[in-house]
Regions:
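PLP-dependent amino-acid enzyme catalytic core
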Residues: 1-107
């Protein structure tokens, strides 16, 4: 696995034992730490699947444009994956979206 490829980091997140929940239930309870994904969200997995499926089924190809209406982490995941595949991404977001998220989506 090429660890320098951002796409290989998606979904490669650790399990973390939830100590209190484990003690309360008498079972080992683990949570998947999705915030370790490049976009810090489980939505990175969805974005990777959507784009790879579209490429596989010849719905989009290198140089193509994706248009997404989003107010959240799906757009961030799509931005990361689209850039890695050489695709253009146009995101439509509400005017009320935070400045930080707008800046992050422009990367």
């Amino acid at each position: 696995m090429d660890n320098n490829n951002v796409l290989n980091q998606i979904g490669n997140t650790p399990l973390i034992k939830l100590k209190q929940a484990s003690e309360l239930t008498g079972c080992n309870i683990f949570g998947k730490a999705e915030y370790f994904n490049p976009g810090e969200s489980v939505k990175d997995r969805a974005a990777l699947f959507i784009i790879e499926d579209a490429i596989k089924n010849k719905i989009i190809q290198k140089g193509g444009v994706i248009v997404e209406g989003t107010a959240g982490n799906t757009g961030i995941g799509l931005a990361i994956v689209a850039k890695a595949y050489g695709l253009s991404l146009k995101i439509v977001i509400p005017r009320t979206q935070s400045i930080e998220k707008k800046k992050y989506l422009k990367i």
